[in-house]
Amino acid sequence: MGELRFKHLFWGSFVESGGTFQTVLIFLLIPCSLTVDYRAAPILSNTTFLWIWNVPTERCVGNVNDPIDLSFFSLIGSPRKTATGQPVTLFYVDRLGLYPHIDANQAEHYGGIPQRGDYQAHLRKAKTDIEHYIPDDKLGLAIIDWEEWRPTWLRNWKPKDNYRNKSIELVQSTNPGLSITEATQKAIQQFEEAGRKFMEGTLHLGKFLRPNQLWGYYLFPDCYNNKFQDPKYDGQCPAVEKKRNDNLKWLWKASTGLYPSVYLKKDLKSNRQATLYVRYRVVEAIRVSKVGNASDPVPIFVYIRLVFTDRTSEYLLEDDLVNTIGEIVALGTSGIIIWDAMSLAQRAAGCPILHKYMQTTLNPYIVNVTLAAKMCSQTLCNEKGMCSRRKESSDVYLHLNPSHFDIMLTETGKYEVLGNPRVGDLEYFSEHFKCSCFSRMTCKETSDVKNVQDVNVCVGDNVCIKAKVEPNPAFYLLPGKSLLFMTTLGHVLYHLPQDIFVFPRKTLVSTP
């Protein structure tokens, strides 16, 4: 196998519409942030951004012909029911306690609705299940996947409205004299109180038994910004849904991890709507993470899939990775969980296809975005915080500059990064990103990145950028008189095309 070179052209616009001189002078004008923005501290040392693998690919790992390279993933766990003692534990409905719910065939389990559930029996069974699936209290993620009903009454729309109907019927059976309006109001109160009791109590039990696990619910928070058919779709979370999330303050305060999802359907393939959809779901998760304590937010781990939910044989393209992974990293979260069903590795030729996709598409992008994020964190935050967009709505990403860096896949199957950072790369970070300090750390944003001399960042199995920061090409003029130098520089910049630093968002893979 020869070497493969991945020329990542994801970097986005370096020069904006304000004029080329703005690029030269803006870094002298940017003030230090007057307010501190916080993010959750890393759960693993030297790991600004955490990659988590939650796909049942055991049969692919170690396969001599088509090994799956998981060296970039710090936490690996299978969602199989037989898997125990993993750093990532996913509790489905049948794996944690006696969760009251109604199945797709309308059969009621453990009371059906939470008001009829046996809470104490649920806790006893949940204790046994937690001790079974997490036998030791080691650091890890504990995600509860309860999707049958939602704790907010009004969010139980069709087909979940059977929970509302049965709740009203329960009230009417014990209070026949109530009007439908009165019965509905009482049903809302009973349902939401019982739902909260089950969800909040289960979190408290988990934290008591396994305090080193980060406990939370899959799909929480959500903001239902999925009306893609609206011609005015802008991705923003509806105000009413943000208000409903505010009313779930008890849930955010009880959670030690937040696990929103940004799975894509085929209609969002290489689509601007996907960018907006992911962006504002993550923005809402960041907002919610600070409800309990703005200076000590809850860590956010965003669920993604490598395939489209309604076309599971089709993998995400490079643009789709930017729309998901690129957005998540640029906004400043704790990590990404890649999940999928057993079919991903069990289809005919599933392992070879997954292996090739990871080798040529996913892993090179992980190398790219992780090293860029670490470089930015090291430059702006002295590794005491993570970089996040100054303006959340801007289309800027934490990517290596394709003019200066190549990512190579060597004959040994390892990745190597060629190239050195330049001052302009660091200035790009400083212009478009701010330092969001890690909680419980004293953090001050670097005011002048021109003073940064070295970059030393690594990812995975020793894939690193360790280099001196090179000056921008213009500085090689070494002017004898500053006025002559600035006149010459201004003349050169004036005649440069406005899009000189605008790169297409595609990846070129070539064999030298």
From Swiss-Prot:
<protein>
    <recommendedName>
        <fullName>Hyaluronidase PH-20</fullName>
        <ecNumber>3.2.1.35</ecNumber>
    </recommendedName>
</protein>
<dbReference type="GO" id="GO:0005975">
    <property type="term" value="P:carbohydrate metabolic process"/>
</dbReference>
<comment type="similarity">
    <text>Belongs to the glycosyl hydrolase 56 family.</text>
</comment>
<dbReference type="InterPro" id="IPR018155">
    <property type="entry name" value="Hyaluronidase"/>
</dbReference>
<dbReference type="GO" id="GO:0007338">
    <property type="term" value="P:single fertilization"/>
</dbReference>
<feature type="signal peptide">
    <location>
        <begin position="1"/>
        <end position="35"/>
    </location>
</feature>
<dbReference type="GO" id="GO:0004415">
    <property type="term" value="F:hyalurononglucosaminidase activity"/>
</dbReference>
<dbReference type="Pfam" id="PF01630">
    <property type="entry name" value="Glyco_hydro_56"/>
</dbReference>
<feature type="glycosylation site" description="N-linked (GlcNAc...) asparagine">
    <location>
        <position position="293"/>
    </location>
</feature>
<feature type="disulfide bond">
    <location>
        <begin position="437"/>
        <end position="464"/>
    </location>
</feature>
<dbReference type="GO" id="GO:0001669">
    <property type="term" value="C:acrosomal vesicle"/>
</dbReference>
<comment type="function">
    <text>Involved in sperm-egg adhesion. Upon fertilization sperm must first penetrate a layer of cumulus cells that surrounds the egg before reaching the zona pellucida. The cumulus cells are embedded in a matrix containing hyaluronic acid which is formed prior to ovulation. This protein aids in penetrating the layer of cumulus cells by digesting hyaluronic acid.</text>
</comment>
<feature type="active site" description="Proton donor">
    <location>
        <position position="147"/>
    </location>
</feature>
<dbReference type="GO" id="GO:0007155">
    <property type="term" value="P:cell adhesion"/>
</dbReference>
<dbReference type="GO" id="GO:0007342">
    <property type="term" value="P:fusion of sperm to egg plasma membrane involved in single fertilization"/>
</dbReference>
<keyword id="KW-0326">Glycosidase</keyword>
<feature type="disulfide bond">
    <location>
        <begin position="60"/>
        <end position="351"/>
    </location>
</feature>
<feature type="disulfide bond">
    <location>
        <begin position="381"/>
        <end position="435"/>
    </location>
</feature>
<keyword id="KW-0378">Hydrolase</keyword>
<dbReference type="GO" id="GO:0005886">
    <property type="term" value="C:plasma membrane"/>
</dbReference>
<keyword id="KW-0130">Cell adhesion</keyword>
<keyword id="KW-1015">Disulfide bond</keyword>
<dbReference type="InterPro" id="IPR001439">
    <property type="entry name" value="Hyaluronidase_PH20/Hyal5"/>
</dbReference>
<dbReference type="InterPro" id="IPR013785">
    <property type="entry name" value="Aldolase_TIM"/>
</dbReference>
<feature type="glycosylation site" description="N-linked (GlcNAc...) asparagine">
    <location>
        <position position="46"/>
    </location>
</feature>
<feature type="glycosylation site" description="N-linked (GlcNAc...) asparagine">
    <location>
        <position position="368"/>
    </location>
</feature>
<keyword id="KW-0336">GPI-anchor</keyword>
<keyword id="KW-0732">Signal</keyword>
<keyword id="KW-1003">Cell membrane</keyword>
<keyword id="KW-0449">Lipoprotein</keyword>
<feature type="disulfide bond">
    <location>
        <begin position="223"/>
        <end position="237"/>
    </location>
</feature>
<feature type="glycosylation site" description="N-linked (GlcNAc...) asparagine">
    <location>
        <position position="165"/>
    </location>
</feature>
<dbReference type="GO" id="GO:0045121">
    <property type="term" value="C:membrane raft"/>
</dbReference>
<feature type="disulfide bond">
    <location>
        <begin position="376"/>
        <end position="387"/>
    </location>
</feature>
<keyword id="KW-0325">Glycoprotein</keyword>
<dbReference type="GO" id="GO:0009897">
    <property type="term" value="C:external side of plasma membrane"/>
</dbReference>
<keyword id="KW-0472">Membrane</keyword>
<dbReference type="InterPro" id="IPR017853">
    <property type="entry name" value="Glycoside_hydrolase_SF"/>
</dbReference>
